[in-house]
A protein has these predicted regions:
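Conserved subregion of the PPM/PP2C metallophosphatase catalytic domain
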Residues: 1-110
């Protein structure tokens, strides 16, 4: 599934961008609403639920709070470094546990 995108602001605060509609790729076509916002010096993080649901040996999920805490430490990093850092965080969390869901994410930043 697609969780709400996270808009991380330079001051460390964040906003969840809640949207409606079906999961991408399920239907051949559908009507959707468009919106605009100024990214400014913020960071936009889009991800699938497999990121926050990724579990370790103790069956503890990675969780939204941990994801936001990680993103707060990355506000001055390039998107490629954020992605590689998050992959490392996820690997350290799940260790050798098999994952049953995709972990897909996208970082947008000026």
């Amino acid at each position: 599934g697609h969780n709400p995108a996270i808009l991380m602001k330079k001051d460390g605060s964040h906003e969840l961008l809640e949207t409606g509609g079906p999961v991408l790729g399920v239907f051949d076509s559908f009507e959707f609403e468009q919106g605009k916002f100024a990214l400014g010096d913020s960071l936009l993080f889009c991800y699938t639920d497999g990121v926050v649901d990724a579990t370790n040996n103790a069956e503890e999920p990675f969780e939204m709070e941990r994801l936001v805490d990680f993103l707060k430490t990355q506000l001055d990093s390039a998107p490629s470094r954020i992605c590689s850092g998050l992959r490392r965080e996820l690997r350290n969390h799940i260790k050798d546990m098999p994952q049953l869901d995709d972990m897909t994410f996208l970082v947008l930043k000026k």
